[in-house]
Swiss-Prot record:
Range of residues in the leader sequence: 1-19
Primary location class: secreted
GN (gene name): abnA
UniProt KW Chloroplast keyword: no
EC number: 3.2.1.99
Domain of life: Eukaryota
Listed pathway(s): Glycan metabolism; L-arabinan degradation
Top EC group: hydrolase
InterPro entries (UniProt xref): GH43_arabinanases, Glyco_hydro_43, Glyco_hydro_43_endo_a_Ara-ase, Glyco_hydro_beta-prop_sf
Function as written in the Swiss-Prot or TrEMBL entry: Endo-1,5-alpha-L-arabinanase involved in degradation of pectin. Its preferred substrate is linear 1,5-alpha-L-arabinan.
Name under which the protein is recorded: Probable arabinan endo-1,5-alpha-L-arabinosidase A
Gene Ontology cellular component list: extracellular region
Length: 321
C-alpha cells in the first residue's frame, strides 16, 4: 500500500470510528470562514459567500466545485456607522421576492457594538450588489444579545431573523414582508447558561414536521495561537421544535434555552472545530450540512479553514451526518 493510500484509509477509519463521514470533495477555492450557500434559479449555478474581503464570494457548477472566487459583495464596505464596517462577517443568503439578499454582520471581536446589514442583487453578478445598511437589528452593551450571525427564515408568509453570539446567545426577530428591516422586538430561542455562553451562528431549517435550529458551540477561532482544551473547540449542535418561534429541545428533551443541544458534528480524525454551518437542499443530493473546518494535516490558522459538506440523514427524526 502506498503512503498516500494509507493516509486516506487511516483518515476514513478514524472518521468512521467517531461515527462521522469525512467532508465531501471540494475543488478550487476552498478556504472559507462562515460559508453561506445558494443556487441561482436562472441557471443552477452555485454561489458561496464567506467572512473576509468585505464578504468574499465564489461560484461553481456544483457543491464540489471547482469554486472560483468572484470578488467582494461590498468592495467599499458597509454604510453602517460602526467599527468594523470595512471587515464584514458571517454572511447569510436568501432569495426574497425574486431578489437575492445577503445579510452581513458589522462588529469587532468581543464587542456588542454590532449590527446586521443587508445587500441585494437581482443576479448575484460581480458589482451588482446594492448596500441597504442596517436592518434595524443592532446591539450595544445595554442589550442582552450581540447582533451578529444573522440567518433569515421564512415560515408561511412571515420572515424571521435568527441571530446572536455569546451573551444571551440566540434571539429571533420578526421581519417586514420584504425582509429588509425588523418588524417587532426580539426574543430568546437558545441559551447556554453555563461558562462563557459559547453559542452562536444559528441556522434554521424545516424538514418534515420539525423546525431544526442548528448552531455552533464552543471556541471558533485562533487555534494556531491558542488551542482550546479538548472538547471546547467549535462543534455543530441542533435542537428542534414543531414551531419556528420557540420551545426548541434537544434529543434528550432538554430545552435549548437551558443549555440543550444535540451534537451533529464535532472534531474527528483530521477534521477539527467544524462550525459556521448552514443547511442547503441540493437538487441531486438532498439536504446538505455545510460548514468550515480545520484540516489538522494542513494548519490551524483561520485563513486555512476549509469548506466542508456532508449529506444529512433525517430518518431518525434528528440530523445525522
Amino acid at each position: 500500500m502506498s503512503a498516500s493510500v494509507f493516509v486516506v484509509v487511516a483518515s476514513c477509519l478514524a472518521a468512521l470510528a467517531h461515527g462521522y463521514a469525512n467532508p465531501g470533495s471540494c475543488l478550487g477555492a476552498c478556504n472559507v470562514h462562515d460559508p453561506a450557500l445558494i443556487r441561482r434559479e436562472s441557471d443552477g449555478k452555485y454561489f458561496r459567500f464567506s467572512t473576509g474581503n468585505k464578504i468574499s464570494y465564489a461560484s461553481s457548477s456544483s457543491i464540489e466545485g471547482p469554486w472560483t472566487v468572484l470578488g467582494s459583495v461590498l468592495p467599499s464596505g458597509s454604510s453602517i456607522d460602526l467599527p468594523g464596517n470595512d471587515d464584514l462577517w458571517a454572511p447569510d443568503v436568501s432569495l426574497v421576492n425574486g431578489v437575492y439578499h445577503v445579510y452581513y454582520s458589522v462588529s469587532t471581536f468581543g464587542s456588542q457594538s454590532s449590527a446586521i446589514g443587508l445587500a441585494t442583487s437581482s443576479t448575484m453578478d460581480l458589482n451588482s450588489w446594492t448596500d441597504h445598511g442596517s436592518t434595524g437589528i443592532q446591539s450595544s452593551s445595554s442589550k442582552p444579545y450581540n447582533a451578529i450571525d444573522g440567518n433569515l427564515f421564512k415560515d408561511g408568509g412571515t420572515y424571521y431573523m435568527n441571530f446572536g453570539s455569546f451573551w444571551h446567545d440566540i434571539y429571533q426577530a420578526p421581519m417586514n414582508s420584504a425582509a429588509t428591516s425588523v418588524a417587532s422586538s426580539s426574543y430568546n430561542i437558545a441559551y447556554n447558561p453555563s461558562g462563557t455562553h459559547a453559542v452562536e451562528g444559528a441556522f434554521m431549517y424545516k424538514y418534515g414536521n420539525y423546525y431544526y435550529l442548528f448552531f455552533s458551540a464552543g471556541i471558533c477561532c485562533g487555534y494556531d495561537t491558542s488551542r482550546p482544551a479538548s472538547g471546547e473547540e467549535y462543534k455543530i449542535k441542533v435542537c428542534r421544535s414543531t414551531s419556528a418561534t420557540g420551545n426548541f429541545v434537544d434529543a434528550n428533551g432538554v430545552a435549548c434555552t437551558n443549555g440543550g443541544g444535540t451534537v451533529v458534528l464535532e472534531s474527528h480524525g483530521n477534521v477539527y472545530g467544524p462550525g459556521g454551518q448552514g443547511v442547503f437542499t441540493d437538487p441531486s443530493l438532498g439536504p446538505i450540512l455545510y460548514y468550515h473546518y480545520v484540516d489538522t494535516t494542513i494548519g490551524y490558522a483561520d485563513s486555512q479553514k476549509l469548506f466542508g459538506w456532508n449529506k444529512i440523514d433525517f430518518s431518525s427524526g434528528w440530523p445525522v451526518v
